[in-house]
Amino acid sequence: MNTQPTRAIETSGLVKVYNGTRAVDGLDLNVPAGLVYGILGPNGAGKSTTIRMLATLLRPDGGTARVFGHDVTSEPDTVRRRISVTGQYASVDEGLTGTENLVMMGRLQGYSWARARERAAELIDGFGLGDARDRLLKTYSGGMRRRLDIAASIVVTPDLLFLDEPTTGLDPRSRNQVWDIVRALVDAGTTVLLTTQYLDEADQLADRIAVIDHGRVIAEGTTGELKSSLGSNVLRLRLHDAQSRAEAERLLSAELGVTIHRDSDPTALSARIDDPRQGMRALAELSRTHLEVRSFSLGQSSLDEVFLALTGHPADDRSTEEAAEEEKVA
């Protein structure tokens, strides 16, 4: 492992333009080495485009970007020697076994046959794929393919690993396995830049998070800092039935004097408040009007609520226009 400077990634005013539209619009990032740095944003926000520029797969149209002090435009070969990229879709060969895929990657990286086979065995066992080492990849489950894909990206251990939505489409058990792999990589000294739409994933893995929208960073910090930025108290409640939500929303708005948020659960409402006593008075008012509250809680803002407040819509809200833009630039 190379000795790393304090910053793994530094960008200033980074720009990428597609057909007159700025997919990335003056992006500033400062990513410390040796941690998981999460990038959150809605579809079309510029996440995948940013990774492709940092990985030297796209040439920026403006601004600067450095990886471990090396400019991605003028020193691309040096940057490539220190990074690896794993995207949403597996880059391994379905016609080969798990072992054969990793041996092939080792040979492409310049390993001898003996060293390539040795490294493949290490990774197969380390990623929990020992029982499937000699099976064709096309027989693997989605979680197994994702683990093999990440293994292929670290045949030569990179200083910086780009993980672009690595758990898209995986079941909860497979996602947890990928999370464990990411934690182990960071413990071993690799810096990870993670893009994801799963806010629980960012909450679990990321040491710091940048929220981007329309190609710009709109907030940055630890998960705790981002949650605290909305205030320390959030009243959450669930009603007995969905039919009473509109009336409860009206009463809470009048009592609290703040915006009331609707959750995807048709019986749920939430509001940010300055004083916990406000919440108790509002609940008492609902009780007086015979609106039945099934449950309530008072606590810190969630990352979902931070995302909603910053971008104006939930993290799982996919508009057709946004999805098409992300597909075009990814």
Curated annotation (Swiss-Prot):
EC top class named in words: translocase
Catalysed reactions, as listed in the record: daunorubicin(in) + ATP + H2O = daunorubicin(out) + ADP + phosphate + H(+)
Entry annotated with the keyword Flavoprotein: no
Protein EC: 7.6.2.2
InterPro entries, per the entry: AAA+_ATPase (IPR003593), ABC_transporter-like_ATP-bd (IPR003439), ABC_transporter-like_CS (IPR017871), ABC_transporter_ATP-binding (IPR050763), DrrA (IPR005894), DrrA1-3-like_C (IPR025302), P-loop_NTPase (IPR027417)
Any GO BP annotation: doxorubicin transport
Keyword vocabulary terms for this entry: Antibiotic resistance, ATP-binding, Cell membrane, Membrane, Nucleotide-binding, Translocase, Transport
UniProt-recorded Gene Ontology molecular function terms: ABC-type xenobiotic transporter activity; ATP binding; ATP hydrolysis activity; GTP binding
All copies of domain ABC transporter, residue ranges: 9-239
Protein origin, superkingdom: Bacteria
SUPFAM superfamilies: P-loop containing nucleoside triphosphate hydrolases (SSF52540)
A Pfam family annotated for this UniProt entry: DrrA1-3_C
Binding site for ATP: 41-48
Cellular component annotations (GO), alphabetically ordered: cytoplasmic side of plasma membrane
Topology relative to the membrane: Peripheral membrane protein
Major localization listed first in the record, in broad terms: membrane
Similarity-based family: Belongs to the ABC transporter superfamily. Drug exporter-1 (DrugE1) (TC 3.A.1.105) family.
Functional note: Part of the ABC transporter complex DrrAB involved in daunorubicin and doxorubicin resistance. Responsible for energy coupling to the transport system. Binds ATP or GTP.
Official protein name in the record: Daunorubicin/doxorubicin resistance ATP-binding protein DrrA
